[in-house]
Each structure stands twice: as structure tokens, then as C-alpha cells.
Amino acid sequence: MRLLYATDASEYQEIPVAVVLPKNEDDLRVLIAFAREHRLGLIPRTAGTSLAGQVVGGGIVVDLGRHLNRIVAFDAGRRRVRVQPGVVPNALNPCLKPHGFLFGPETSTANRAMIGGMVGNNSCGSNSIVYGSVRDHLISTRGFLSDGSEVTFGPLNAAEFAAKCAGPD
């Protein structure tokens, strides 16, 4: 299996130390603790459709697309959808279309690229002049830091930004 994850759509190749396919966030927490204890790098990955080699490396490849691929919540009134990193745009848009919505970034790999990788790359596509890139459709993103703590990244108002700047490093 490590050979399958030694490359992406680029020409780069490096066999990872291991490959992990977490089924839930608890698996991720355990993995982060293990990697930290053993001083191993984690390489998050979804479909591996990028041409630049971002998901290739000698650490532990973490395939977030295999099992974490659900549309978690949709609120048409608030114009919000929450997805896991393994959701494919061509699976998301048919759910949004009856409500008059669209996830605009339409890459040439929209039938296999996954939202997690698209966020990491700020992907766009042939319609980006009209619909923008992923950052134009992203309100917040949630993840884990190397100490296992959960973090949400999103917009800050001026007071929140000042508080972050004044806080501990």
C-alpha cells in the first residue's frame, strides 16, 4: 500500500513511512499523539490529484478521503454546508443544485478531487473568473494542531484579531 501513496498526479515520488486511513476524529487524535511521540511528520492527503507533489513525502501519509467523505450538514437558509475532507465536488453539487446553490470551483478533476485537498491548494478552475477559488466559498475550516488540540480557522473582526496578536505565542 505504501507504493500506492508514494506519488500523486505529479512526477514526484517518495515512499512514506506508513499510510493511515482514519475512520473518524478519534483515530486522528491517536495518530497525532503517535506521530508526536515518535517525531514523525504527518502528510494529510485526499485524492492526490494535484500536480505539484504536496502529498508526497517520507512521513506518515494520512488518507483523509477514504472514510471521511460525508456531507455533514446543509442549511439552505444560512447558505451553509459542512463537509468532511473526502467529499468530491461532483457529489456535493447535485445536493446543492435543487436549492439554487453551487460550489463554484470547478477543477478539471471535479469528479475525483476532494474538498480537503482543494482547500489546501485554494483550487479554482475554468469558471474562477465568475465563481472564484475555494477561499471565496470557505467560511471556516477545522483541524488539529500537532499537540492534538482542535482548532477552527475563520475570519476575525478587528477586536478578535487584536486579542490574538496580544495573546501568548
Predicted regions located by residue number:
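FAD-binding subdomain of flavoenzyme oxidoreductases
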Residues: R70-F74, R80-D169
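Residue-level detector of anion-binding/catalytic polar loops
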Residues: L40-G41, L102
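Pocket-edge structural micro-motifs
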Residues: P22, P44, L64, P85, ...
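Charged, amphipathic alpha-helical interaction segments
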Residues: D27, L40, N122-G125
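Short, basic and Ser/Thr-rich N-terminal targeting/leader segments
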Residues: Q13, R36-H38, R45-A47, A113, ...
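Extended, hydrophobic alpha-helical segments in both membrane/secreted and soluble proteins
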Residues: L42-P44, L51-A52, L92
